[in-house]
A protein has these predicted regions:
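Hydrophobic transmembrane alpha-helices and immediately adjacent juxtamembrane helices
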Residues: 1-272
């Protein structure tokens, strides 16, 4: 374990340093995310103001507000840029340096992202989560229940990130065949934002659409962890959701290994 840690700690440090080096870029993107969250809030406020009912699909305005906030936080922590990194490295030829290192190909990207995710969690997610937990407790909710849901949220969040990471690894492997993934990456991210419940909770879709989207792996990325922390899932629903996340994680890991074996024959180096 110590040997493994020493092998991958440079990648963790690289992820931290990259985030620090491009902090202005990171801040500007987050400002854009916050503006998007405000737009979503006022759109939902208009919907509830025009409705005669205090609840829509079981959500109050307070629930939707919490959903929007936690969707923003969850998206920060589950987002993976591994497909972009693979695409860029294949395009400029630097992928050969990663392939020559005595480390697992996918694990090198994983530990690089974990470095930046840890910094994001400490600086952004933890303050948000602490305030929400405190507000829930002050509102009269049982402390044990709040802490339990928070723990389950963090566990589900970890599974969500790993699912998204290995999905992006699978997608990134197509760069060995198509060489340029920039446009397809943008399309992929837009579709995932829709299907993950990041923009609209899946409960608001027609039942058959909601059932299909809820089974797909993308609902595990945002919708599942957010519904847990918002308190919209009971114990049996939480168990089913976590088991589904485990299922998709196993599928994505297995699929990444299978695709990696197939695409190695397509490796050609571009660049200088």
């Amino acid at each position: 374990m110590v040997k493994l840690w020493r092998r991958y700690i440079p990648f963790i440090n690289a992820g931290i340093q990259e985030l620090i080096s491009y902090r202005v870029n990171f801040i500007l993107y987050r400002i854009g995310d916050v503006m998007g969250a405000f737009v979503a809030f006022y759109l939902w406020k208009a919907v509830f103001d025009s409705s005669q009912e205090p609840l829509i699909q079981g959500f109050s305005m307070a629930d939707i507000t919490l959903y929007i906030i936690m969707s923003f936080v969850t998206n920060l922590l589950t987002r993976s840029d591994s497909s972009f990194m693979i695409g860029d490295e294949v395009k400029d030829g630097s992928i050969i340096m990663r392939l020559l290192r005595p480390v697992h190909f996918a694990a090198s990207y994983l530990f690089t992202e974990l470095g930046s995710k840890w910094l994001i969690f400490i600086s952004v997610a933890l303050p948000f989560l602490s305030v929400i937990v405190l507000m829930k407790i002050l509102s009269g909710q049982w402390i044990v229940e709040v802490l339990g849901l928070t723990t389950l949220y963090l566990f589900s969040l970890t599974l969500a990130y790993l699912i998204n990471f290995f999905f992006n690894i699978c997608f990134g492997f197509s760069a060995f065949v198509f060489k340029n993934l920039w446009g397809s990456n943008l399309l992929k991210n837009s579709l995932i934002a829709f299907m993950s419940g990041s923009l609209i909770p899946l409960a608001f879709f027609p039942k058959i659409v909601s059932d299909i989207l809820s089974f797909l792996p993308f609902s595990s990325l945002i919708y599942t962890p957010v519904m847990i922390i918002v308190g919209k899932y009971d114990a049996s629903q939480i168990l089913q959701a976590l088991l589904l996340q485990f299922f998709w994680l196993i599928v994505m890991v297995g699929l990444s290994q299978l695709i990696w074996k197939r695409v190695q024959s397509f490796i050609t180096i571009q660049g200088g």
